[in-house]
Amino acid sequence: MGERIRGLYLVTPDAADSATLLASVERVLPARPALLQYRNKLADPLRQLDEARSLRQLCSSAGVPLIINDDVALARAVAADGVHLGRDDGSPAAARAVLGADALIGVSCYDEWVRAEDAAAAGADYVAFGAMFPSSTKPGAVRAPLTLLTRARAALDCPVAAIGGITLDNAPALIEAGADLLAVISDVFAAADPLQRALAYSALFA
């Protein structure tokens, strides 16, 4: 990746139906998040494909890169900008072989420094640590210390993402510790005014 990407990294919420999901995303895209990740652990593959295609169109129109969670094949099928890999989703090199040299490939590193080193060495475009705080999306997720963000920012060439339980109140501490990207679901999409909340996050990076 060229210029170091920084800002709000929006992750889609679980939604009862596709229309609700797409309306929620369309509402916040004017905030121009740095990235938008499509994450849906509940839908069947056909619905995932339909939603990802629709999100691709919305994101392309808004100039926001679309990342697909955990599914290289789906990312390729909809010509997404990249993929986010978890523990069992393969290597950055394998994903790049499928998606191409320009794909944005992120890797979940949880609280594991060695995993982050390995991911960066394998060509990851960003590494993600978390949960940084208790998370309603993943209540049992392992907690990662803020010191990992600082260490990664100093030692790795790729951007550093923080995820898990992030709010406007704790976000400044994460940025100060070294986070380039703040991955947020609930604190934006469950807000009374999601667009204004997203804009408030983006302003933290101004």
Swiss-Prot record:
GO terms for biological process: thiamine biosynthetic process; thiamine diphosphate biosynthetic process. Its cofactor is Mg(2+). Pathway: Cofactor biosynthesis; thiamine diphosphate biosynthesis; thiamine phosphate from 4-amino-2-methyl-5-diphosphomethylpyrimidine and 4-methyl-5-(2-phosphoethyl)-thiazole: step 1/1. It comes from Azoarcus sp. (strain BH72). This is Thiamine-phosphate synthase. InterPro entries: Aldolase_TIM (IPR013785), ThiamineP_synth_sf (IPR036206), ThiamineP_synth_TenI (IPR022998), TMP_synthase (IPR034291). One of its GO terms (molecular function) is magnesium ion binding. Belongs to the thiamine-phosphate synthase family. Pfam families: TMP-TENI. 4-amino-2-methyl-5-(diphosphooxymethyl)pyrimidine binds at residues 37-41, 69, 108, 138. Mg(2+) binds at residues 70, 89. CDD domains: TMP_TenI.
